[in-house]
């Protein structure tokens, strides 16, 4: 397979419809068209765009959960099929600043202006 074919099978960009920081839940809610069976085609470009290292990938019948590292902060990227819900979360209140910064990296990925808070 040549590199052109590889690029076509693994998109470099993603489109996010909406992203919202939830300070109380220590998370970023993401609304996008995500295919559960091809989650990596959404998650890998998102991790690259956020300059995150993928440390671990877990999945089950209706859920994906990836452990991400951003400059020493551990974050979880979640996607649940039945609720069609995606979010990035931290368990550490101090990392809310990291989520706030990641929102600045997500904004260029938004499909329409005004789709973030």
Predicted regions mapped to residue ranges:
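Acidic, proline/glycine-rich low-complexity IDRs
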Residues: 1-10, 50, 55-57, 93, ...
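Negatively charged, low-complexity tracts enriched in Asp/Glu with abundant Ser/Thr
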Residues: 2-59
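Short acidic/glycine-enriched loop/turn segments that link adjacent beta-strands
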Residues: 23-24, 61-64, 83-84
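Amphipathic, interaction-prone secondary-structure segments
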Residues: 48-76
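Short, compact, well-ordered microdomains
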Residues: 67, 73-106
């Amino acid at each position: 397979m040549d590199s052109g074919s590889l690029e076509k099978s693994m998109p470099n960009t993603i489109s996010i419809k909406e992203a919202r920081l939830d300070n109380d839940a220590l998370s970023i809610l993401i609304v996008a068209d995500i295919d559960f069976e091809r989650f990596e085609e959404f998650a890998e470009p998102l991790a690259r765009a956020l300059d995150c290292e993928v440390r671990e990938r877990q999945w089950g019948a209706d859920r994906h959960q990836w452990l991400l590292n951003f400059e020493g902060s551990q974050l979880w990227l979640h996607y649940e099929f039945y609720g069609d819900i995606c979010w990035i979360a931290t368990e550490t209140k101090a990392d809310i600043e990291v989520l706030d910064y990641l929102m600045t990296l997500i904004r260029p990925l938004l499909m329409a202006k005004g789709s973030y808070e």
